[in-house]
Amino acid sequence: MAVKSDAWIAKMALEKNMIEGFIPQQVKVNQKGEPGLSYGLSCYGYDTRCIDEFHIFSNVNPQAAGFVDPKNIQATSKHFIVHKGDHCIIPPNSYVLTSTVEYFRMPRNVTGLCLGKSTYARCGVHLNTTPIEAGWEGHITIEISNNSGLPVKVYAHEGIAQILFFESEDCAISYADRGGKYQGQRGTTHAKV
C-alpha cells in the first residue's frame, strides 16, 4: 500500500468527487491576496483548509463538570465556546475543534491519514484526527492543540492539515457498511457514543 500521487488525487477528486471543494494546485495566499498557509493539491497529498467556526475548549464554565467525559456528551459540550471569525486564538495548553472546508468521500479501497502542517507544528500547534476510513464521507473534524505556553493564532480558510491517501484492495466491510456514527457529518462534530 503506497501513498498516492497528485495525479491520482486529482483524478479521484474530479472523476469520483472524492474531495468536494477540491483545489487542483497549491495556493499560497489568503483570501486577501496576502501570503498565507498553503492549501490545495500537493505532490503526495492534499492540504485542506478549516472553516471559520471554532469550538474553543474552556474550563471556566461553572455549569460544566470539572472533567471531560467522552461518554457524557452533554456535560462535555458545555466546555466549548463557539467563535466565528477569520482566525481563532487558542489559549495555552488548550485545544479547538473545527472542521474542513472540503467534504470527503472515501472509496471503499482508500484510507486517509490527516497530518498537521509543519508551520503550525513549529509554533507548538499539533493536530489530532483519526484515520479517514474506507467508505466514510463528511467534513473532517479536526482537533487543534496548543502545546505552547502562549496563545496561538490559527487561520480559517488557509492550510491546516495534509491528507495522505492510501489505496489497497476493497475492504470486506467499509465504514459506511458498518453504519459508522460519524458518517455524513457536516461541520464540526463533537464526540458521540
Task: Tell where the protein language model's regions lie, with residue ranges.
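Non-catalytic terminal segments and appended small domains
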Residues: 1-193
